[in-house]
């Protein structure tokens, strides 16, 4: 999974990126300190996988990972090449979802590119640039469909009509993900890789005094309402606090520091969970003496397709899957004990994978 971290200059996105990846990219207090995208890969914390590691002592331990891309800041006119806009737009297209960092605190010592804190205005600035870029893409798609239809392929008449409707929606300053249409039409639109179709987490960057009570912050309330109207998520976070936590290497010291602050889990953990929820993702686990590994799949994935994540031969020659829920395995202590209690199931091609399934796939090619 790849998440693009975006936001106006000086809203805290590079500070957040530094905290969650320990990448050490610049986070200075001036516009465009992030000129090129900085990429960091972080492991997805999973206590289930760690338990399996302690049981099997494998040669290799492979958690699921998320790739975070810190992309250069935007200003008005970015879709037309102002600031660093063109580079931003090309880099954001490759992401699975967007983490849009929004400033939700007042601080006279930290300059704001627009002069004052106004999270909805800031969101509108970036979203408008994304909409403008999508308009250009949709216009080209309509032209291409019209030409194909005139060439005799009448199937493209429907495509032209669908994208004309979307174009009208975008020209009203609305996001593609809020377009009301049939599932078939949306499936067609999804083939266009539009920026405003991407799922978005609005990371509301609060100050240290507010992050534990975000609902009391009017800025956050506004961001949350907007996110809900778009079918997205608003996540309260304090980038500065996350940076302080990330500087602590000792786990016990880190836990003590978080307890003193009243923070139960890090912003990274909450961001990862929010990403999985928003994109409809789950993890299944494989375990043995060679490797313990977590695999990320979409909710609703059937066993053969999950097996294909490991290797295409597993899907092609799928026979069955030996499955046990992690909690059942942990309760029993060992796989042998779980088998003795009849908790290990044999599942076929129609089995829908569940989060936390511990699986052994049987195949023949």
Regions found by a protein language model. Name each.
Residues 40-45, 72-82, 93-156, 169-182, ...:
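Conserved Switch II/interswitch segment of TRAFAC-class P-loop GTPases
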Residues 32, 46-49, 62-68, 82-95, ...:
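Amphipathic alpha-helical transducer elements in NTP-driven molecular machines
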Residues 1-111, 139-140, 144-145:
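Conserved G1/Walker A P-loop phosphate-binding module
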Residues 22, 54, 90, 94, ...:
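Short, intrinsically disordered, mixed-charge
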Residues 2-6, 11, 17, 144-352, ...:
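C-terminal-of-GTPase-core extension/linker across diverse P-loop GTPases
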Residues 23-31, 38-40, 48-51, 80, ...:
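Glycine-rich, flexible loop/turn motifs
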């Amino acid at each position: 999974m790849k998440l693009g971290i975006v936001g106006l200059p000086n809203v805290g996105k590079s500070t957040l990126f530094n905290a969650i990846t320990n990448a050490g990219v610049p986070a200075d207090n001036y516009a465009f300190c992030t000129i090129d995208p900085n990429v960091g890969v972080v492991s997805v914390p999973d206590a289930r996988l760690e338990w399996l590691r302690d049981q099997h002592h494998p040669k290799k331990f492979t958690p699921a990972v998320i790739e975070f891309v810190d992309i250069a800041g935007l200003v008005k006119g970015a879709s037309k090449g102002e600031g660093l806009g063109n580079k931003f737009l090309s880099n954001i297209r490759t992401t699975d979802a967007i983490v849009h960092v929004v400033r939700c605190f007042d601080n006279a010592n930290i300059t704001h590119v627009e002069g004052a804190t106004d999270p909805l205005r800031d969101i509108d600035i970036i979203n408008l640039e994304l909409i403008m870029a999508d308009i250009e893409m949709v216009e080209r798609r309509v032209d291409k469909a019209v030409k194909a239809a005139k060439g005799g392929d009448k199937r493209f008449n429907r495509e032209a009509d669908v994208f004309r409707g979307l174009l009208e929606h975008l020209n009203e300053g609305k996001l593609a993900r809020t377009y009301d249409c049939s599932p078939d039409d949306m499936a067609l639109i999804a083939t266009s890789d539009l920026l405003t179709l991407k799922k978005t987490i609005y990371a509301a960057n609060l100050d240290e005094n507010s992050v534990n009570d975000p609902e009391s912050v009017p800025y956050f309330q506004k961001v949350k309402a907007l996110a809900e109207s778009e079918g997205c998520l608003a996540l309260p976070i304090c980038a500065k606090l996350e940076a302080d936590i990330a500087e602590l290497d000792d786990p016990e010291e880190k836990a003590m520091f978080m307890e003193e602050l009243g923070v139960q889990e890090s912003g990274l953990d909450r961001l990862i969970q929010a990403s999985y929820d928003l994109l409809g993702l789950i993890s299944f686990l494989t375990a043995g003496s060679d490797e313990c590994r977590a695999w990320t799949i979409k909710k609703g994935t059937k066993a053969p397709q999950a097996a294909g994540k490991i290797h295409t031969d597993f899907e092609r020659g799928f026979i069955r899957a030996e499955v046990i829920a992690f909690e059942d395995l942990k309760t029993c202590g060992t796989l042998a004990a779980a088998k003795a209690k009849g908790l290990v199931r044999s599942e076929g091609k129609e089995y829908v994978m569940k989060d936390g399934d511990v699986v052994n796939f049987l195949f023949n090619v």
